[in-house]
């Protein structure tokens, strides 16, 4: 049964170490089975590795990586006259960060490094340098939107 109203969005609290809501969302994304402590130690450990590797503030490197991962355009299926078209649409800001975090964590999990801490750190470093699987995912999404530009007039 459908809702009468939209479910309210829960406000995410900024994390205690970096005072950033984006870091909290990353921790939530990495968390499995409600083990927030484990997820937090993975994220903070990865940030320590980033700081050692670059000498820069880990939060700045992470934000740069997110900027390089977050998509601007995506395609959505739209049914017109019996056939489905992939229509390119702009991505809302909230969805941009959600997709960026999802792609970052997915790409980290598929990497070959030994621990999740290492994988996450390397993926963030790669993404900040505009390389890596998560950036490739964004490029593929943009390429798909560009290829279907002819159907942009079906936008709703």
Swiss-Prot record:
Belongs to the universal ribosomal protein uS7 family. Keywords: Ribonucleoprotein, Ribosomal protein, RNA-binding, rRNA-binding, tRNA-binding. It comes from Streptococcus mutans serotype c (strain ATCC 700610 / UA159). Disulfide bonds: none annotated. GO terms for molecular function: rRNA binding; structural constituent of ribosome; tRNA binding. GO terms for biological process: translation. One of the primary rRNA binding proteins, it binds directly to 16S rRNA where it nucleates assembly of the head domain of the 30S subunit. Is located at the subunit interface close to the decoding center, probably blocks exit of the E-site tRNA. Part of the 30S ribosomal subunit. Contacts proteins S9 and S11. One of its GO terms (cellular component) is small ribosomal subunit. InterPro entries: Ribosomal_uS7, Ribosomal_uS7_bac/org-type, Ribosomal_uS7_CS, Ribosomal_uS7_dom, Ribosomal_uS7_dom_sf. This is Small ribosomal subunit protein uS7. The gene is rpsG. HAMAP family: Ribosomal_uS7_B.
